[in-house]
Design a protein with these regions (language model features):
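Terminal, regulation- and interaction-focused segments at domain boundaries
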Residues: 16, 24-27, 64-71
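Short, solvent-exposed recognition patches
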Residues: 34-153
Protein backbone atom coordinates (compact mmCIF):
# COMPACT_ATOMS: atom_id res chain seq x y z
CA UNK A 1 0.00 0.00 0.00
CA UNK A 2 2.89 2.39 0.68
CA UNK A 3 4.02 2.54 -2.99
CA UNK A 4 0.49 3.58 -4.01
CA UNK A 5 0.41 6.37 -1.39
CA UNK A 6 3.85 7.54 -2.49
CA UNK A 7 2.74 7.50 -6.13
CA UNK A 8 -0.36 9.61 -5.40
CA UNK A 9 1.70 12.05 -3.32
CA UNK A 10 4.16 12.48 -6.19
CA UNK A 11 1.33 12.97 -8.69
CA UNK A 12 -0.27 15.68 -6.56
CA UNK A 13 3.10 17.32 -6.10
CA UNK A 14 3.83 17.20 -9.84
CA UNK A 15 0.53 18.94 -10.61
CA UNK A 16 0.99 21.58 -7.91
CA UNK A 17 4.56 22.65 -8.77
CA UNK A 18 3.79 24.33 -12.13
CA UNK A 19 0.75 26.07 -10.68
CA UNK A 20 2.61 28.03 -8.04
CA UNK A 21 2.05 31.74 -8.46
CA UNK A 22 5.64 32.90 -9.00
CA UNK A 23 7.40 31.74 -12.16
CA UNK A 24 11.05 30.77 -11.95
CA UNK A 25 12.09 33.58 -14.28
CA UNK A 26 11.06 37.15 -13.65
CA UNK A 27 11.28 40.12 -15.95
CA UNK A 28 11.26 43.33 -13.90
CA UNK A 29 9.87 45.29 -16.84
CA UNK A 30 6.78 43.06 -16.84
CA UNK A 31 4.72 45.58 -14.89
CA UNK A 32 5.56 48.52 -17.18
CA UNK A 33 2.96 48.59 -19.95
CA UNK A 34 4.74 49.93 -23.05
CA UNK A 35 1.59 51.32 -24.70
CA UNK A 36 -0.39 50.09 -27.69
CA UNK A 37 2.09 51.58 -30.17
CA UNK A 38 4.52 48.80 -29.12
CA UNK A 39 2.01 46.04 -29.94
CA UNK A 40 2.85 43.74 -32.88
CA UNK A 41 -0.03 45.01 -35.02
CA UNK A 42 -0.25 47.37 -37.99
CA UNK A 43 -0.14 51.08 -37.23
CA UNK A 44 -3.12 53.33 -37.84
CA UNK A 45 -5.79 51.01 -36.47
CA UNK A 46 -8.88 52.61 -34.92
CA UNK A 47 -9.52 51.74 -31.26
CA UNK A 48 -12.89 50.22 -30.39
CA UNK A 49 -14.43 50.93 -26.99
CA UNK A 50 -15.05 47.77 -24.93
CA UNK A 51 -18.56 46.68 -24.03
CA UNK A 52 -19.52 46.69 -20.35
CA UNK A 53 -18.97 42.92 -20.16
CA UNK A 54 -15.56 43.21 -21.83
CA UNK A 55 -14.58 45.99 -19.43
CA UNK A 56 -15.51 43.79 -16.44
CA UNK A 57 -13.39 40.94 -17.81
CA UNK A 58 -10.46 43.28 -18.49
CA UNK A 59 -10.59 44.55 -14.89
CA UNK A 60 -9.52 41.10 -13.64
CA UNK A 61 -7.02 40.40 -16.42
CA UNK A 62 -3.29 40.44 -15.49
CA UNK A 63 -2.35 42.98 -18.13
CA UNK A 64 -4.14 45.19 -20.65
CA UNK A 65 -6.69 44.45 -23.36
CA UNK A 66 -7.30 46.62 -26.42
CA UNK A 67 -9.56 46.15 -29.42
CA UNK A 68 -8.80 47.79 -32.75
CA UNK A 69 -10.05 47.72 -36.35
CA UNK A 70 -8.76 48.52 -39.82
CA UNK A 71 -12.32 48.58 -41.17
CA UNK A 72 -12.21 45.00 -42.44
CA UNK A 73 -10.74 43.19 -39.43
CA UNK A 74 -10.98 43.26 -35.66
CA UNK A 75 -7.74 42.95 -33.66
CA UNK A 76 -8.01 41.88 -30.02
CA UNK A 77 -4.65 42.68 -28.44
CA UNK A 78 -3.70 41.57 -24.95
CA UNK A 79 -0.54 42.59 -23.15
CA UNK A 80 0.04 39.88 -20.55
CA UNK A 81 2.45 40.43 -17.66
CA UNK A 82 2.29 36.96 -16.05
CA UNK A 83 1.18 33.43 -16.88
CA UNK A 84 -2.56 33.14 -16.46
CA UNK A 85 -5.49 30.89 -17.27
CA UNK A 86 -7.47 34.06 -18.12
CA UNK A 87 -5.73 34.03 -21.48
CA UNK A 88 -7.49 31.34 -23.47
CA UNK A 89 -8.04 30.50 -27.13
CA UNK A 90 -10.61 32.51 -29.06
CA UNK A 91 -12.27 29.20 -29.93
CA UNK A 92 -13.32 28.78 -26.27
CA UNK A 93 -15.30 32.04 -26.34
CA UNK A 94 -16.66 31.44 -29.82
CA UNK A 95 -17.90 27.94 -28.96
CA UNK A 96 -19.62 29.38 -25.87
CA UNK A 97 -21.33 31.94 -28.13
CA UNK A 98 -22.67 29.21 -30.43
CA UNK A 99 -20.11 29.34 -33.24
CA UNK A 100 -18.86 26.19 -34.91
CA UNK A 101 -15.06 26.15 -35.00
CA UNK A 102 -12.93 24.30 -37.54
CA UNK A 103 -9.15 24.32 -36.94
CA UNK A 104 -7.08 25.15 -40.01
CA UNK A 105 -3.35 24.69 -40.68
CA UNK A 106 -0.88 27.10 -39.11
CA UNK A 107 -0.75 30.31 -41.15
CA UNK A 108 2.76 31.53 -42.04
CA UNK A 109 2.73 35.25 -42.75
CA UNK A 110 5.02 37.00 -45.22
CA UNK A 111 6.90 38.54 -42.28
CA UNK A 112 7.79 35.06 -40.94
CA UNK A 113 5.29 35.07 -38.08
CA UNK A 114 3.08 32.04 -37.47
CA UNK A 115 -0.57 32.05 -36.51
CA UNK A 116 -2.97 29.45 -35.17
CA UNK A 117 -5.94 29.65 -37.54
CA UNK A 118 -9.58 28.60 -37.42
CA UNK A 119 -12.63 28.96 -39.60
CA UNK A 120 -15.70 29.87 -37.53
CA UNK A 121 -19.36 30.11 -38.42
CA UNK A 122 -22.56 31.20 -36.69
CA UNK A 123 -25.61 31.09 -38.92
CA UNK A 124 -24.59 32.86 -42.13
CA UNK A 125 -21.66 34.72 -40.54
CA UNK A 126 -18.30 33.19 -41.43
CA UNK A 127 -14.92 34.39 -40.18
CA UNK A 128 -11.31 33.38 -40.20
CA UNK A 129 -9.66 33.74 -36.79
CA UNK A 130 -5.89 33.94 -36.38
CA UNK A 131 -4.04 34.11 -33.09
CA UNK A 132 -0.52 34.08 -31.72
CA UNK A 133 1.42 34.98 -28.61
CA UNK A 134 4.87 36.54 -28.79
CA UNK A 135 7.38 37.54 -26.12
CA UNK A 136 9.74 40.51 -26.22
CA UNK A 137 12.50 38.30 -27.64
CA UNK A 138 10.38 37.25 -30.62
CA UNK A 139 9.59 33.73 -29.39
CA UNK A 140 6.09 32.82 -30.55
CA UNK A 141 3.31 30.39 -29.71
CA UNK A 142 0.31 29.55 -31.87
CA UNK A 143 -1.31 27.55 -29.07
CA UNK A 144 -2.38 29.14 -25.78
CA UNK A 145 -1.87 25.93 -23.79
CA UNK A 146 1.73 25.57 -25.01
CA UNK A 147 2.37 29.21 -24.05
CA UNK A 148 0.79 28.75 -20.61
CA UNK A 149 2.92 25.75 -19.67
CA UNK A 150 6.07 27.38 -21.01
CA UNK A 151 5.33 30.50 -18.95
CA UNK A 152 4.06 28.68 -15.83
CA UNK A 153 7.11 26.43 -15.73
CA UNK A 154 9.36 29.48 -15.97
CA UNK A 155 10.83 28.69 -19.39
CA UNK A 156 10.44 32.34 -20.34
CA UNK A 157 9.62 35.56 -18.58
CA UNK A 158 6.92 37.93 -19.71
CA UNK A 159 5.52 40.17 -20.69
CA UNK A 160 3.87 38.80 -23.80
CA UNK A 161 1.63 40.13 -26.55
CA UNK A 162 -1.36 37.97 -27.53
CA UNK A 163 -3.00 39.02 -30.78
CA UNK A 164 -6.23 37.62 -32.20
CA UNK A 165 -7.50 38.73 -35.61
CA UNK A 166 -11.11 38.26 -36.71
CA UNK A 167 -11.41 38.69 -40.47
CA UNK A 168 -13.52 37.64 -43.45
CA UNK A 169 -12.71 34.15 -44.76
CA UNK A 170 -11.07 35.83 -47.77
CA UNK A 171 -9.76 39.41 -47.61
CA UNK A 172 -12.08 41.87 -49.41
CA UNK A 173 -11.02 42.88 -52.93
CA UNK A 174 -8.26 45.46 -52.81
CA UNK A 175 -7.47 44.84 -49.13
CA UNK A 176 -3.99 43.49 -48.45
CA UNK A 177 -3.79 40.69 -45.85
CA UNK A 178 -2.11 42.10 -42.72
CA UNK A 179 1.03 40.91 -41.07
Amino acid sequence: MKPVVCFYFLCVRAVWIPLRSTPTLRNDSADAFPGWAAAPIPTGLAPIAPSEREARFAAGFPGKIGVFSDGARIYVVRWVRTSTRKLHPASDCLLALGYSVKPLPIFASTDGSHWGTSSVQHGTERLRVRERIVDLGGREWTDVSAWFWSAALGHNAGPWWAVTIFEPPEPPAGVKAPL
